[in-house]
UniProtKB/Swiss-Prot annotation:
Disulfide bonds: none annotated. This is tRNA(Ile)-lysidine synthase. ATP binds at S27, G28, G29, A30, D31, S32. Keywords: ATP-binding, Cytoplasm, Ligase, Nucleotide-binding, tRNA processing. It comes from Bacteroides fragilis (strain YCH46).
């Protein structure tokens, strides 16, 4: 019986126990309906979670009405959440598919905790796993992308990976259980559906058992991936710093390309970008590569990895306090880098806080000649990322302070000074000077 196969799979993969509460993700489609009916018939305690993404007009409401009826007839507690998926996708600059995925899994986990469920059960099956392998191959992937869908990912479990789509449909027909059909699954519209409706039928002409062959291959690769991931984990410890990747250490590894892929691919960098990054390792610093929310900057000795903040900051991430004092023999000039001291009588123009820019010059404190800010920062071995984050305080057109770094000699205090201006960095996330 199909129940025995699913029960054996749950036990083999240690997905959950009979006394655990299972939160079943219920779309109303054949797969999720079969999952709920199977688990209930096997004696598991289930609650259901349904998402209404409002993407398919009347179909979305039809699906909700169906799962309400199904859960009512089955005596299953149902939880429903409505999402403005289009607005979320627009705000986050992601696809509708990705938006729906993020929204539903975030809500599933929140609901799981609220309901004290042990796991979230999704209805992925063998065919889904095969499609995932092919999709990853088409996009470009590492060894982990060839493993297909795994039985467990944290609190998310997939009890139906032991079944094919055909077996699921046959089971529903056997128990005379209806379900709803998502019309988009029948349209050659999304990439996964192109694989399902176009590519796989062609592959089956070459090998009628192609799905089973792919599943067997993923199982063989799983053991190899375990060893591979252990080696990658050890390599990460050798090459990574809090700022990024040590280039020299990476190049000493036996497979630097594979390590680079495993570090950067999860951050949204595709295979072409990673190849381009690899080719810059021996080159000059300065190149910037953008992933999805992250960027890599080729510096002298490091590949700097940081969140993408390329949009120009309109305000500095700190607050300055300006105070004026009489300059007497008892006055002690502060020495820390977060404080600047100026001769007040040399300041007769408005002040401005801004990012430094190419061509900026100043006279570093203690020197007599002008120096380009870019050269100063390079001499101080600032990384490219640190250079981008450097702000300056200007009086009129002249730079008075590389904030947090060094003041300009033209505004220094001397024996003729009568009044001093003290400027201090006192906190983050503000945009003005207090006087």
């Amino acid at each position: 019986m199909i129940q025995n196969r699913v029960a054996q799979y749950i036990e083999k993969e240690k997905l959950f126990c009979l006394n655990d509460k299972v939160l079943v993700t219920l779309s109303g489609g054949a797969d999720s309906v079969a999952l709920l009916r199977l688990l209930l018939s096997m004696g598991y305690t289930c609650e259901a979670a349904h998402c209404n993404f409002h993407l398919r007009d009347k179909e979305s409401d039809r699906d909700e009405a169906f799962v309400r009826r199904l859960c009512h007839e089955s005596g299953v507690l149902l939880h429903i959440e409505h999402f403005d998926t289009t607005q979320y996708a627009t705000k986050k600059h992601i696809s509708i598919e990705m938006a729906a995925r993020e929204l539903r899994y975030e809500w599933f986990e929140t609901l799981r905790k609220q309901r004290e469920a042990s796991v979230i059960a999704t209805a992925h099956h063998k065919d889904d796993s095969v499609e995932t392998v092919l999709l990853n191959l088409i996009r470009g992937t590492g060894i982990n992308g060839l493993l297909g869908i795994r039985p467990r990912n944290g609190n998310i479990v997939r009890p139906l990976l032991c079944l094919s789509r055909e077996e699921i449909i046959a089971y529903l027909q056997y128990i005379d259980q209806d379900y709803v059909t998502d019309s988009t699954n029948l349209l050659d519209e999304y990439t996964r559906n192109k694989i399902r409706l176009n590519l796989l039928p062609l592959m089956k002409e070459i090998n009628p058992s192609v799905k089973e062959s792919i599943i067997r291959t993923t199982n063989y690769l799983n053991d190899a991936a375990t060893l591979y991931n252990q080696s990658i984990g050890e390599a990460r410890k050798r090459i990574l710093t809090p700022e990024g990747i040590r280039i020299e250490a990476l190049l000493q590894e036996p497979v630097p390309e594979a390590i680079l892929f495993e570090v950067l691919h999860p951050l949204g960098f595709n295979t072409t970008q990673i190849d381009n990054i690899r080719q810059t390792l021996d080159g000059q610093p300065g190149k910037v590569f953008l992933g999805k929310g992250w960027r890599v900057i080729k510096d002298r000795d490091l590949l700097l990895i940081e969140e993408d903040t390329t949009a120009e900051e309109s305000q500095p991430p700190f607050r300055l306090v300006m105070e004026e004092y009489d300059y007497t023999s008892e006055f002690i000039i502060p020495k820390d880098k977060n404080t600047a001291c100026f001769d007040a009588d040399k300041i007769n123009k408005t002040w401005e806080i801004r990012k430094w820019k190419p061509g900026d010059v100043f006279i570093p404190f203690g020197m007599t000649g002008k120096k380009h800010v870019s050269d100063y920062l390079t001499d101080k071995k600032f990384s490219l990322s640190e250079k981008e984050k450097q702000w300056v305080l200007c009086f009129g057109e002249q730079i008075a302070w590389l904030i947090g770094e060094r003041t300009d000699n033209r505004f220094k205090v001397n024996e003729n000074t009568k009044r001093v201006i003290i400027v201090r960095i006192v906190s983050e996330h503000s945009d003005f000077i207090e006087e």
